[in-house]
């Protein structure tokens, strides 16, 4: 309730979307136009795998066009302990480090860390024992800010209640997302929060006042999306071999250099442990 006794507005966000820059099947402009015309989302986050160039481009395009939904820059970081969403970041987070080091780097960059599709017995998912170790770590920088308590994939459906219970037991914010790799999937999972803006969403995650919602995929629909992803990967591999970078709305055609496999800022970073270039 607000001070005058009225109910505060509730916003809706989908904070896990992929574009053609990683393994999604739609470009930045397509996604923005779809969100504007076909959803009631107030916020979206572009979270390609281990890169932020398309997310930065999406934010700029949305602002320039005056689109309704605000864009948060993010990425889905590949850590050794599972995938984690980095939200509100302005630089890439180094991949393939421990989950605790990854989360600490996200926080050091001013971001929020949300383990994606956790507890599912799959190599890309943070397991309970790993998360419990982080929660017991005396360094608060290693603690996640919430959990992706709803992800519509049918693979994770059997573990959904367990994830919700884990978040509740450990005081972690609920975050629901679509993990969309196709336009039709955007908004199939969502997060509701008091307010409408990105700043209000961030405050809600930090104070644990978010809620998740969504509808699980049917297996047949997911198989269709996987088929499209495989065809897209084949085209990407062909273009890499041919030395071409396609101008397909990924963000690279908005002035961001680098091929699909070597995103910007990767080549110039040093390993923090050895000082050697990677």
Question: Where do the model's predicted regions map?
Answer:
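Charged catalytic cores and adjacent phosphate/nucleic-acid-binding surfaces used
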Residues: 1-38, 53-59, 66, 78-93, ...
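Active-site flanking residues adjacent to catalytic metal/cofactor-binding acidic residues
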Residues: 15, 47, 75, 116, ...
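Loop/turn elements at helix/coil->beta-strand transitions in domains of secreted/extracellular proteins
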Residues: 40-41, 67, 109-112
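Short catalytic-loop micro-motif centered on adjacent basic/acidic residues
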Residues: 43-47, 148-149
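Acidic, metal/ion-coordinating pockets
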Residues: 50
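A short, structured active-site edge motif that brings together acidic residues
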Residues: 71-79
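Aromatic-lined carbohydrate-recognition surfaces of secreted/lumenal glycan-active proteins
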Residues: 114-124
